């Protein structure tokens, strides 16, 4: 997806109608935090959107930076943090670029439903960026649509959404091949989730930087 496409969505569509925008953090992320598997630390939310998950983490003691290619989303995210009274930093940055805007390194990086917006030929650059900004032993958590997800026509690797965006649906093997050169994969499985408007099957990948 191009930056202008994402910014167009945030500019022209109410937040409550954006399918991936949820004020409540996903159960899988909450579980990582509440179990102590990921403890409060320096964290980056890759493709943070309106910043809801970054705000949640900041409220539980994490030092969080959120980045997104959409300037409109970043402005909304900062307002959300201010409204909730938490300290979080939000930057306009393209995860497929050089990430010069990100001058720090982190102990935890995560993306929730970002990777399926990135086509296979561009994923290596993204994963290299994610690894580069993590400290040695840092954790990385990725969730993206699985190829067996029943939504958006229910078949095909590339599927068009009602917003006009095109998503790529990955298999577990594809993600293993993508991540293993850069990360130790601690957990890779397919889980069901409930999003705002539909149920999905997603790839859940929890890793440690090599």
Where are these regions (language model features)?
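Short catalytic micro-motifs in class I SAM-dependent methyltransferases
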Residues: 113-117
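Class I (Rossmann-like) S-adenosyl-L-methionine-dependent methyltransferase catalytic domain
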Residues: 1-44, 50-102, 118-129, 139-210
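A conserved beta-strand element that flanks and buttresses the S-adenosyl-L-methionine
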Residues: 110
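Short, conserved loop/helix-junction motifs that constitute active-site signature segments
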Residues: 132
């Amino acid at each position: 997806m191009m930056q202008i496409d994402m910014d167009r969505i945030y500019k022209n569509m109410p937040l409550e109608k954006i399918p991936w925008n949820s004020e409540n953090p996903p159960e899988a992320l909450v579980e990582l935090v509440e179990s102590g598997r990921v403890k409060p630390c320096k964290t980056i939310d890759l493709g943070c959107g309106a910043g809801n998950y970054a705000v949640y983490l900041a409220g539980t003691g994490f030092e969080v930076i959120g980045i997104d290619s959409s300037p409109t989303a970043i402005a909304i995210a900062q307002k959300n943090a201010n409204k909730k009274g938490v300290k979080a930093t939000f930057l306009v940055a393209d995860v497929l670029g050089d990430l010069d805007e990100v001058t720090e390194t982190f102990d935890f990086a995560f993306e929730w439903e970002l990777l399926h917006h990135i086509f296979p030929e561009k994923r290596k650059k993204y994963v290299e960026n994610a690894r580069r900004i993590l400290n040695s032993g840092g954790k990385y958590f990725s969730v993206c649509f699985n190829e067996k997800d029943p939504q958006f026509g229910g078949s095909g690797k590339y599927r068009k959404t009602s917003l006009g965006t095109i998503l790529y649906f990955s298999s577990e093997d594809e993600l293993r091949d993508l991540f293993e050169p850069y990360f130790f994969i601690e957990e890779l499985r397919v889980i069901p989730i409930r999003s705002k408007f539909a149920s999905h099957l997603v790839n859940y990948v929890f890793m440690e930087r090599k």
